[in-house]
């Protein structure tokens, strides 16, 4: 059975229990959460995350291999502002503690941005930060995400990610999250030659490091370096290629996580597409009228 889910929120009093309930409603058997708002550092204490009730609900409903995503504000690639780097290191340590408490094994991290100083300065800074953060005795791995190459993002090529991994002391605590929109926007031809892309990944990084897949279509043509997610089948990657990736035999054990946009033009009335997209990807049938159906439901 394919391991597929989506990003779900974790908030209110229910916290982890609410996340699991949403995932089950979507027909998922895994999910990804932020431990709080991705744009800030405000977090509830671990004892208020409702972990016990959430874990029981997950077990009862066959949910496993959940994933945590670190917030966007962490940038350990910043070599200009020491305060930004230190904030990133300290907050990431706390996020790993929360990830472990939640029972997740993977925390996805955008590697960082060099803020105009060039990858030759950003990459050593990321290595320095990861060396401060990683605990060889932890059960959690940091899954470095493949990036689209927007702005000064680092991680736009497999080579950049490999360079980071090679520089880190306890790099057995590092894994990779492959985002389909990001690698498409970075220039990799996943539409016509996903097997070739995987082969390249295996040679440069090693397929064993791949632990999470973000399944997103793209609003942009290959190589655009934009990072704008589109709903499954409505973008430049297309349904067939994404269905192939979700069901690829080399990725069968990995959680596939949808981060596609909510549907609707009215900002106050947008609806999650995940139940419908998960169903489409499981069954292999693309519905070109999906967006209208979601809004009519």
From Swiss-Prot:
Q: Which UniProt keywords apply?
A: DNA damage, DNA repair, Endonuclease, Hydrolase, Metal-binding, Nuclease, Zinc
Q: Coding gene?
A: nfo
Q: Does the keyword Secreted apply?
A: no
The record's top EC class is: hydrolase
**Official protein name in the record:** Probable endonuclease 4
Enzyme nomenclature, EC number = 3.1.21.2
**What family does the entry list?**
Belongs to the AP endonuclease 2 family.
Q: Which cofactor does it need?
A: Zn(2+)
Return the cofactor note field.
Binds 3 Zn(2+) ions.
Coiled-coil regions listed:
none
Q: Which GO terms describe its molecular function?
A: deoxyribonuclease IV (phage-T4-induced) activity; DNA binding; DNA-(apurinic or apyrimidinic site) endonuclease activity; phosphoric diester hydrolase activity; zinc ion binding
Q: Which residues bind Zn(2+) 2?
A: 145, 179, 214, 259
Entry's InterPro entries? AP_endonuc_2, AP_endonuc_F2_Zn_BS, Xyl_isomerase-like_sf, Xyl_isomerase-like_TIM-brl
Binding, Zn(2+) 1: 69, 110, 145
**GO BP terms, alphabetized:** base-excision repair
List of residues binding Zn(2+) 3: 182, 227, 229
Q: Which reaction does it catalyse?
A: Endonucleolytic cleavage to 5'-phosphooligonucleotide end-products
Species of the source? Oceanobacillus iheyensis (strain DSM 14371 / CIP 107618 / JCM 11309 / KCTC 3954 / HTE831)
Tell me the Gene3D superfamilies matching this sequence.
Answer: Divalent-metal-dependent TIM barrel enzymes
Q: What the protein does?
A: Endonuclease IV plays a role in DNA repair. It cleaves phosphodiester bonds at apurinic or apyrimidinic (AP) sites, generating a 3'-hydroxyl group and a 5'-terminal sugar phosphate.
